[in-house]
C-alpha cells in the first residue's frame, strides 16, 4: 500500500473516498470541514446534530457526494472521546478505515491525520497510521485456488495535512511503521504456514533470508553440533521426529562499545503432537502454531536489522518437532541439559521448556547479559489470561517495567505473574534436579520458573504467548490466525535500551 502526505484541501481531493475523523461529542465542524459541508448541503452537520452519527470509536457512516465534490464518498469516522485517544487508537482507527474502504471497493482513500491535535508527535502519528494500515491489509490466502485476495483493497492512502513543516516527520514515521509492520507480517506468515511446509529446516532457511537481507551474522547448528555441546534436553524432544532439528543463532551488534547484549530466545516447535503423551485429536491442527515465540523473535530481528538501533542483540531459536515414535522420549526418562542439570520427564507434552533451556544456556555462552524468551508454553496461561494478555514471569522487576513500557508502545498487553519461592518447590524432582511439570496448579508460573533455573542470575523475562499468538477473529488491525504478537514489543524493548 502506498501512503503519503497530501496538502490539498479536503473538499478538492479526487479519491474514491475521503475519511473525516470526528470526536465523540463534537457539536461543530472546523472551518475546512464547514466549507465542504456547505457543498454537501449541510449533511455532515445534520448527521451530527441528529445523532445519526455520534463519533464513538470505530463508528462509521458513509455519505455519497453525488458529484458535489470530487470524491465519490465521504466516510465519517468516530474517533471516540478526545481524552481517550492514544497511540494504539491511531492504529485501530486506521485499520478500520482500510477494512471499511476495502468493503466498499475504494482503492484511493484520503483521510485526515489522527492524533496531531492531541499533541502526539507527527513521526509517531505517521508510524502508527502506517502500522494500522499495513497490518489491517494483511491476508494469508496463498493456498486458496479461488477467492484469493486479488489486490482489491486500498492501493493508495493519502494523509491530508496542511502544515508542511511536519511532513518530513510524518513521512519518517511512515517508513518506521512500514518496517514494524513488515516484521510483524513475517511472524504472522510463519505462524500461519502449515507444518508440512514450515519444517525446522524451512524455518532456518527463512532466518538465513532475514539475516542476509540486513547483513546480520547467522549460524545454524545441526543435530551433530548440538550433540557435541551436550544439548540433551533439546535433543531429547526431537528424538521421535524424522525432521532434523535446527538451532538458529542470529547476531546484531549496533553498539560495539556497549557490553550489554540482549538475548532473545524463541520456542520453535513447528509441530507439537505432544509426543508419547499425545494430545487429543480435536484442536491438534492448531499445534502448527507452537512456534509463535520463534516467529516473534525472527520478526523482531527483521525489524532490528532494518531500523538498526544502537544495541547488541543475540537471537536464538530452537526449531524442531515433538512426535511419537519408537525412538521418542518417554515419561519417566531423565534428560541432561547443556548446563548439566538433570530433568525428570513426567509429561512429554511439556516439551517447549526443554528446548528453551538449552537455547537459553547457548545464548548465555554466546555472551548474552540478559534474556527475554517467548513461547506458546502453557494452556494454563489461556485459563488465567484468555486471549488478551501475554503472561510474564521474571526475576527482575526493573526489567519488567521496561517491558511494560515497550508493550504499551506496541499496543500489546502484558502482565507479570508472581514468582514466590514456594512455586519453585513445585518443580523439584525426587530423582533428578528438576521435573518438567510442576505439581497441580500454577502451571504458567511453574513453567516460567523452570526456565528461570537456567538463566544463571541474569536479568530475565519469560513471555508466555499461548493465548495471544493467534487471533481468534478479525478485529482492529488483527486478522484471524497468527497475530505476530511480540515482534513490535521486542523491538521497542530493545530500542529503549540504547545507550
From Swiss-Prot:
Mn(2+) 1 binds at residues 272, 349, 351. Its main location: cytoplasm. Its EC number is 3.4.11.1, 3.4.11.10. InterPro entries: Leucine_aapep/pepB, Macro_dom-like, Peptidase_M17_C, Peptidase_M17_leu_NH2_pept, Peptidase_M17_N. It catalyses: Release of an N-terminal amino acid, Xaa-|-Yaa-, in which Xaa is preferably Leu, but may be other amino acids including Pro although not Arg or Lys, and Yaa may be Pro. Amino acid amides and methyl esters are also readily hydrolyzed, but rates on arylamides are exceedingly low; Release of an N-terminal amino acid, preferentially leucine, but not glutamic or aspartic acids. Transmembrane segments: none annotated. CDD domains: Peptidase_M17. Pfam families: Peptidase_M17, Peptidase_M17_N. Mn(2+) 2 binds at residues 267, 272, 290, 351. The keyword Ligase does not apply. Binds 2 manganese ions per subunit. One of its GO terms (molecular function) is metalloaminopeptidase activity. It is found in: Cytoplasm. Keywords: Aminopeptidase, Cytoplasm, Hydrolase, Manganese, Metal-binding, Protease. It is an enzyme of class 3 (hydrolase). Its cofactor is Mn(2+). Presumably involved in the processing and regular turnover of intracellular proteins. Catalyzes the removal of unsubstituted N-terminal amino acids from various peptides. This is Probable cytosol aminopeptidase. The lineage of its organism: Bacteria, Bacillati, Bacillota, Clostridia, Peptostreptococcales.
Amino acid at each position: 500500500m502506498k501512503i503519503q502526505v497530501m496538502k490539498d484541501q479536503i473538499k478538492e481531493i479526487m479519491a474514491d473516498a475521503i475519511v473525516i475523523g470526528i470526536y465523540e461529542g463534537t457539536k461543530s465542524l472546523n472551518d475546512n470541514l464547514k466549507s465542504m459541508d456547505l457543498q454537501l448541503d449541510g449533511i455532515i452537520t445534520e448527521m451530527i446534530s441528529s445523532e445519526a452519527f455520534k463519533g464513538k470509536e470505530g463508528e462509521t457512516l458513509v455519505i455519497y457526494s453525488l458529484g458535489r465534490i470530487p470524491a465519490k464518498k465521504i466516510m465519517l469516522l468516530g474517533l471516540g472521546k478526545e481524552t481517550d485517544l492514544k497511540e494504539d487508537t491511531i492504529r485501530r482507527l486506521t485499520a478500520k478505515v482500510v477494512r471499511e474502504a476495502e468493503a466498499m471497493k475504494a482503492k484511493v482513500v484520503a483521510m485526515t491525520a489522527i492524533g496531531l491535535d492531541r499533541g502526539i508527535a507527527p513521526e509517531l502519528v505517521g508510524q502508527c497510521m502506517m502500522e494500522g494500515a499495513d497490518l489491517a491489509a494483511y491476508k494469508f490466502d496463498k493456498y486458496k485456488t479461488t477467492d484469493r485476495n486479488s489486490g482489491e483493497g486500498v492501493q493508495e492512502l493519502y494523509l491530508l495535512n496542511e502544515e508542511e513543516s511536519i511532513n518530513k516527520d510524518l513521512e519518517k514515521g511512515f517508513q518506521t511503521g512500514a518496517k514494524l509492520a513488515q516484521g510483524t507480517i513475517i511472524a504472522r506468515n510463519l505462524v500461519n504456514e502449515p507444518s508440512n511446509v514450515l519444517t525446522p529446516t524451512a524455518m532456518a532457511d527463512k532466518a538465513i533470508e532475514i539475516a542476509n537481507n540486513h547483513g546480520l551474522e547467522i549460524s545454524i547448528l545441526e543435530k551433530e553440533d548440538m550433540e557435541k555441546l551436550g544439548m540433551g534436553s533439546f535433543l531429547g524432544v526431537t528424538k521421535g521426529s524424522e525432521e532434523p532439528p535446527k538451532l538458529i543463532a542470529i547476531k546484531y551488534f549496533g553498539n560495539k562499545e556497549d557490553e550489554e547484549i540482549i538475548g532473545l530466545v524463541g520456542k520453535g516447535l513447528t509441530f507439537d503432537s505432544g509426543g508419547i503423551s499425545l494430545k487429543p485429536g480435536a484442536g491438534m491442527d492448531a499445534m502448527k502454531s507452537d512456534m509463535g515465540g520463534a516467529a516473534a523473535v525472527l520478526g523482531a530481528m527483521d525489524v532490528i536489522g532494518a531500523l538498526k538501533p544502537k544495541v547488541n542483540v543475540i537471537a536464538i531459536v530452537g526449531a524442531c518437532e515433538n512426535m511419537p515414535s519408537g525412538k521418542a522420549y518417554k515419561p519417566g526418562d531423565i534428560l541432561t541439559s547443556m548446563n548439566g542439570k538433570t530433568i525428570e520427564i513426567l509429561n512429554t507434552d511439556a516439551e517447549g521448556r526443554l528446548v528453551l533451556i538449552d537455547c537459553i544456556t547457548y545464548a548465555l555462552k554466546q555472551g548474552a547479559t540478559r534474556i527475554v524468551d517467548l513461547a506458546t508454553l502453557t494452556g494454563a496461561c489461556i485459563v488465567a489470561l484468555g486471549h488478551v494478555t501475554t503472561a510474564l514471569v521474571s526475576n527482575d522487576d526493573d526489567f519488567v517495567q521496561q517491558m511494560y513500557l515497550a508493550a504499551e508502545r506496541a499496543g500489546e498487553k502484558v502482565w507479570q505473574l508472581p514468582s514466590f519461592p514456594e512455586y519453585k518447590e513445585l518443580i523439584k524432582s525426587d530423582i533428578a534436579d528438576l521435573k518438567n511439570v510442576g505439581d497441580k496448579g500454577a502451571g504458567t508460573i511453574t513453567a516460567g520458573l523452570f526456565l528461570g533455573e537456567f538463566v544463571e542470575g541474569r536479568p530475565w523475562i519469560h513471555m508466555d504467548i499461548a493465548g495471544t499468538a493467534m487471533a481468534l477473529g478479525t478485529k482492529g488491525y488483527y486478522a484471524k490466525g497468527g497475530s505476530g504478537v511480540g515482534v513490535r514489543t521486542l523491538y521497542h524493548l530493545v530500542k529503549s535500551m540504547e545507550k
